[in-house]
Amino acid sequence: MGSKTPERDGHKGQENTTGPVECPLGGMPRGMHLATDGDGTIGDSGDDDDGEAHSTALINANANGNQKKKRKSKKKGKKKAAKQSSPPRVPLSQLFLQGKYPIGEVQEYQPNVENTSRTTAEEVRYKSRSHLEDDSFLNDYRKAAEVHRQVRKWTQERVKPGQGLMEIAEDIDDGVRALLGHAGLEPGDSLKAGLGFPTGLSLNNVVAHYTPNPGQKDIILQSSDVMKVDFGVHINGWIVDSAFTMTFDPVYDNLLAAVKDATNAGLKTAGIDVRISDVSAAIQEAMESYEVEIGGKTFPVKAVRNITGHNIKHYQIHGGKSVPFVKNSDQTKMEEGEIFAIETFGSTGRGYIYDDVGVYGYGKSYDAPRQVSLPLASARSLYKTINENFGTIVFCRRYLDRLGLQRYLAGMNTLVQHGVVDVYAPLVDIKGSYSAQFEHTVLLRESNKEVISRGDDY
């Protein structure tokens, strides 16, 4: 989820549910197909000549019976992992029975020419971020990343022109919730695990922050569209933020290649003690080396100048540090233990965004109090719902409707006016332009960086 600049403040910039697992071992269940005893039947005619024969038959019968009774007990079959459904709805806990989730792409740090040591303030900040070396924390974060990979894989394979954006968004939302095993319908459940922010489906010149909401006319995906798919997955407030772009016409291939290359350049450059300005320069150099021909006209791919990547904090998608896509003089450094969403946006337009009409979503201000005293009862009730279900995680009207809320817009406007809730608008470039986005979450660990959301797709 991109951070529009300038920032308001700061640096500019499992419970796992387990269900029954089928284990088709084949054959009939134990106890349903037992062999009979091998005992022979002895006749009543006590003929002396048959005595020896009867005696032999009895011995043989008993021997056969004893052999049959010495059956080997069947070994219990091991519990087999379930297979993912289509659409994805099987919780990850049923797919990874050992509870261990895949590690992301591990990259070594590039040599740091300056190699400056941490200041005392940086050391203090690092101590508050030592969780990046905690196995339990990492496993949960990797689980969230695996949820993202599985949901986006299905999206890339199944979404086609002719579908409405509302259907696509709800399929992604439902997939994330199902794989996490948290429906998010009870107070506090979506704070344990859920969506990191509203699923973004931004078309063409809409660069970022569009999601279908109730009351809007549904938009139908066209074969000529360029769609940015940006969604987040969190467990215990730690968000995996990753995005990709879908097209259905090869004419846009160079646009996508430019943005993907720029994102990878940013990931390669990022590291401990690296200046953000150096990451920005690498992104712009890669991005603007491309051009794209559309309708017989050639367009340079421009890095969008007033939206940025960002660091991620606990329950906070935009942590205060920004990573622009153009050269700048920012001497701020990335630090050990930080988490960054390295994303890039490229456009065939002006490369400059502005707020469009409408609302993408809302988010409780990070410095807002736990309780507010407002005259409007609906505002107080809505604020309680926000605290119980979202905290500081960004949400949208679609999520409020899902909880069964009605007639809440007046209360929401009151919360926005009093500065306790922020409102986010769609971000657009000039009409007729096309834009693309790719994004990954990277953990700056002590000995290496882990691109935790990396997959086979991008």
Swiss-Prot record:
GO MF annotation list: aminopeptidase activity; initiator methionyl aminopeptidase activity; metal ion binding; metalloaminopeptidase activity; metalloexopeptidase activity
Biological processes, Gene Ontology terms: proteolysis
Residues making up the signal peptide according to the UniProt record: none
Enzyme Commission number(s) from the entry: 3.4.11.18
Residues binding substrate, per UniProt: H209, H318
Gene Ontology, cellular component aspect: cytoplasm
UniProt catalytic activity: Release of N-terminal amino acids, preferentially methionine, from peptides and arylamides
Cofactor notes: Binds 2 divalent metal cations per subunit. Has a high-affinity and a low affinity metal-binding site. The true nature of the physiological cofactor is under debate. The enzyme is active with cobalt, zinc, manganese or divalent iron ions. Most likely, methionine aminopeptidases function as mononuclear Fe(2+)-metalloproteases under physiological conditions, and the catalytically relevant metal-binding site has been assigned to the histidine-containing high-affinity site.
Residues binding a divalent metal cation 2, per UniProt: D241, H310, E343, E439
Main location: cytoplasm
Bias kind Basic residues: ranges: 67-82
Cofactor requirements of the protein: Co(2+); Zn(2+); Mn(2+); Fe(2+)
Disordered: annotated segments: 1-93
UniProtKB keywords: Aminopeptidase, Cytoplasm, Hydrolase, Metal-binding, Protease
Start-end of Basic and acidic residues biased regions: 1-14
Coiled coil regions in record: none
Binding site for a divalent metal cation 1: D230, D241, E439
Entry annotated with the keyword Hydrolase: yes
Subcellular location: Cytoplasm
Similarity field: Belongs to the peptidase M24A family. Methionine aminopeptidase eukaryotic type 2 subfamily.
Record's function text: Cotranslationally removes the N-terminal methionine from nascent proteins. The N-terminal methionine is often cleaved when the second residue in the primary sequence is small and uncharged (Met-Ala-, Cys, Gly, Pro, Ser, Thr, or Val).
Protein name, UniProt field: Methionine aminopeptidase 2-2
Native species: Emericella nidulans (strain FGSC A4 / ATCC 38163 / CBS 112.46 / NRRL 194 / M139) (Aspergillus nidulans)
